[in-house]
Amino acid sequence: MFKIATLADWFGVGLIEGIRESERCGATGVQIYAADQLDPRTLGKDELQRVKRTLSDCHQTVTALCGELGGYGLEKTADNPEKIAYLKQVIDLGLELGCRVVTTHIGVVPRDKSNPRYAVMRDACAELGAYAAANGGWIAVETGPEPIDVLSAFIDECGAGVGVNYDPANIVMVTGVDHVEGVRIAGKRIVHTHAKDGKNLIPVNAEQFYHGFAEGGLEWMQSQGVLI
């Protein structure tokens, strides 16, 4: 049976109280952002023990950690060493919390494999996947920016330890494709899912949409009538 979890941070009451709220609403698991209070780069032993104790007291399993990378994900060679190091720390933290899945947004995978960005992203994911697999874990790439067949083929090239975090709302809102068919295409690559809903209101170019945010392109978004 699938484990149903909440996103602890989204209760808006802080991490510890968010874990407690997850139990109160009947869930048995939580996904947590590896940031702020749970940023592995600054997390102290006492705080880690407090989180572990709260999880145990509230009968919550950490189903996944979310390692957010900010603008461009893993698209830029110059930025990747720092981002890869961070995600490896998140993988280690996940293992400490009994969690084998780290979800992340890697940017927009080009359809054209000859695009230089493709190899940059593939090599970064392959390194992270190998690190995760060696520890029995997964890096789960969130769906959305590119068609699911493109992402699936990309993940196959990355090797062990790289899977899909299947977000049906992202797929529908950005690519406008059938999310059910997307599950069939991604298949066993799926290691984590998000329960979200959404509609595609207007056609969008995924690279312009995602890179618009990364470049501070809010005015572009407004001019396209996406923000109303």
What are these regions (language model features)?
Residues 9, 35, 70, 107, ...:
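Flexible loop residues that form catalytic
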Residues 31-56, 105-113:
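Glycine-rich, proline-tolerant flexible connector loops at the mouths of alpha/beta enzymes
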Residues 4, 21-27:
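A short, Lys/Arg-enriched amphipathic alpha-helix followed by its capping loop at the start of a domain
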Residues 25, 33, 96-97, 135, ...:
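Structural motif
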Residues 30, 65, 123-228:
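Acidic/histidine-rich catalytic cores of soluble enzymes
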Residues 14-20, 54-58, 73-166, 173:
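Active-site acidic/histidine proton-transfer and metal-coordination neighborhood
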Residues 1-14:
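Boundary/entry segment of secreted carbohydrate-active catalytic domains
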Residues 28-35, 61-66, 100-104:
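Short, well-structured secondary-structure segments
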